């Protein structure tokens, strides 16, 4: 992302957003580190943007970013295997406590496909439709995350621009969550957590 793109992003952000998240899910973040430092400069026009700034690295990279002090909020992609949530949150927690910043998952989700609970980030995974796989994964994520007071929320992947009908959704093995059984789990979680530190 060059200076022209950053300025355009700045113009849109000032008008439209309360939080700006730079995402690329990249492992080599030297360019983004420079971008974050530029964003934090008080003498630049960018300071017209008064919202929060975050960066969303790919999963497993949270403790490899050396410039979290340049952003307001630490974020990450939450595509962890169903049986590894606790250990990954333990690892992420060390970074969150070190930098003393809020944290959220800027992207998290799982397909409704057999086997996707173990490799939720692999959208190319072939397998049969299994709606319960998605439900199990979300239950595991929410159960592990609700015990972490430093975790402030999730951007769930995915909400399609065109919502499917219930009959379409129940045949859909993608990350889509609308009109699927997992929607009930998500609703219950947020109803229960309303007013707590997670919200």
Where are these regions (language model features)?
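Nudix hydrolase/Nudix homology domain
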Residues: 2-44
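Generic hydrophobic alpha-helical scaffold/packing signal
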Residues: 18, 93, 135, 139-143
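Conserved active-site loop/cleft motifs that coordinate metal ions or position small ligands
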Residues: 20, 29-32, 103-107, 152-158
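Alpha-helical elements of Rossmann-like donor-binding domains used by nucleotide-donor carbohydrate transfer enzymes
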Residues: 33-37, 140, 185
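The substrate-binding groove and active-site-proximal loops of carbohydrate-active enzymes
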Residues: 45, 77-84, 124-133, 172-176
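Short beta-strand/loop segments at the ligand-binding rim of alpha/beta enzyme cores
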Residues: 47-54
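Glycoside hydrolase catalytic-domain groove-lining segments
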Residues: 54, 58-122, 142-151, 177
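Aromatic-rich peripheral "rim/lid" segments of glycoside hydrolase catalytic domains that contact
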Residues: 66, 115, 120-123, 132-137, ...
């Amino acid at each position: 992302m060059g200076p022209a793109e950053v300025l355009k992003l700045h113009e849109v952000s000032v008008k439209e957003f309360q939080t700006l998240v730079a995402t690329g899910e990249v492992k080599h973040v030297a360019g983004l580190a420079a971008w974050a430092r530029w964003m934090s400069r008080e003498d630049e026009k960018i300071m017209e943007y008064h919202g929060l700034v975050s960066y969303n690295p790919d999963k497993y990279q949270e403790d490899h970013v050396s410039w979290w002090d340049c952003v307001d909020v630490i974020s990450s992609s939450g595509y962890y295997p169903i049986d590894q949530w606790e250990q990954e949150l333990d690892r992420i927690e060390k970074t969150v406590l070190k930098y003393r910043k809020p944290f959220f998952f800027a992207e998290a989700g799982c397909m409704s496909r057999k086997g996707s609970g173990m490799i939720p980030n692999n959208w190319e995974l072939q397998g049969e439709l299994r709606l319960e796989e998605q439900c199990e994964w979300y239950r595991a994520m929410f159960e592990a995350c609700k015990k972490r007071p430093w975790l402030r929320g999730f951007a769930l992947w995915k909400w399609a621009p065109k919502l499917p009908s219930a009959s379409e959704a129940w045949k859909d093995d993608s990350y889509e969550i609308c009109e699927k059984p997992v929607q009930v789990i998500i609703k219950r979680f947020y109803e229960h957590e309303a007013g707590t530190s997670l919200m």
